Amino acid sequence: MKCPLDKNDMIMVEHRKIEIDFCLECSGVWLDSGELELLVGVLNAEGADLHLNELLSKPAGQGKWRCPICAHKMNKIWLGKGAKILIDSCPLGHGMWFDAGELQKVLREMEPAGAPANTTVIDFLGTAFQATHGKDSKG
């Protein structure tokens, strides 16, 4: 799959049967439809019934990047519960694009308040993506 930003080939990283497409050049992440819900479910087993519709806002307008699957221009949407993050989403529902660091921010935002969250996925993402660039794990 090609990166929507720089058109470079992305690598596929798999964790707990969730495929994450990662661009080595810009550090962006593509999640196919349904994969964000799977990541949220891994983070918070009790909140696994959380639906993506609860986290999405209405589109904030059309973005300039195209979906790597269907080539339609993606919509800009706000994602999250509190401190929302502006991401790109395919208008046909193929998936979502996260610029460098945005996926980790969204996942941290979705951690349950006051409960020890399973941060394995966030730690894995940070370590895997930083390792591909030879960076240390400071964050």
Give the positions of each predicted feature.
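Short cysteine-rich clusters marking metal-coordination/redox-active sites
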Residues: 3-6, 23, 67-70, 90
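Short Cys/His-rich Zn2+-coordinating modules
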Residues: 4-10, 44-55, 71-76
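Short functional micro-motifs and their immediate structural scaffolds
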Residues: 10-11, 31, 75, 98
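Short, flexible, mixed-charge glycine/proline-rich loop motifs
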Residues: 12-17, 54-66, 79-84
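Short metal-binding segments enriched for Cys and/or His
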Residues: 29-45, 94-111
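Short, intrinsically disordered terminal segments enriched in charged and Pro/Gly residues
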Residues: 38-57, 107-139
